[in-house]
Amino acid sequence: MQKTFQLLRRGDLEAIRQILDKKPEEVNAVSGDKPKRDQGQSLLQVAIKSGHLDIADLLIDRGADLNFIEEPTELNPFCQPVIQTAGGRAVFDCRRMIKRWNGQYEMYSSKEKSDQSFKVFKKMLELGADISQKDSHGGTLLQTVLIETKEVLPSLLLENKRNKR
């Protein structure tokens, strides 16, 4: 199983597909102690979190648990439903200009990455992911999405404050 997570982290879609063809039950595999950053998380969570959305899409098509939430551990006391991970990723990957240290602006994320993140999130919603689930701090999907927008909307509003009426 650790090998599956390593292949996932490398973004090896074909290797993951082959594993699922041989062992369909692996679709809901949960990471063990290593790597620590993935401890207790599902393949789908790790695929979304690491930005391997083509693999996330495959896992969803193969029946991954859309309502999974990991158990708290000493290393990772914060637990989040996979739908919150997907919602946060969809906002995080949205196209926007970001200001770099040198004052120059550049586009963050590509149109393709943004569209893919949104597609995965929307697919999960359409397939019935439970949007009422709460994370270990009591936060909801809506709160997660709003928190993620802090990177997108406030800077845009502040940079355009001259547009007051």
Predicted feature descriptions by range:
Residues A15, D54-I55, Q116-V120, V152-L153:
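Conserved ankyrin/ankyrin-like repeat signature
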Residues M1-Q6, A29-Q45, I69-S109, K134-L146:
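Ankyrin-repeat boundary/"N-cap" motif
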Residues Q39-G40, K113-V120, M124:
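Extended HEAT/HEAT-like alpha-solenoid repeat tracts in very large eukaryotic scaffold/adaptor proteins
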Residues L142-V152, E159-R165:
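Short, intrinsically disordered, charge-balanced linker/junction segments flanking boundaries
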Residues Q18-E26, D57-L66, K122-D130, L156-K164:
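Ankyrin repeat domain, specifically the short helix-to-loop turn at the C-terminus of the second helix
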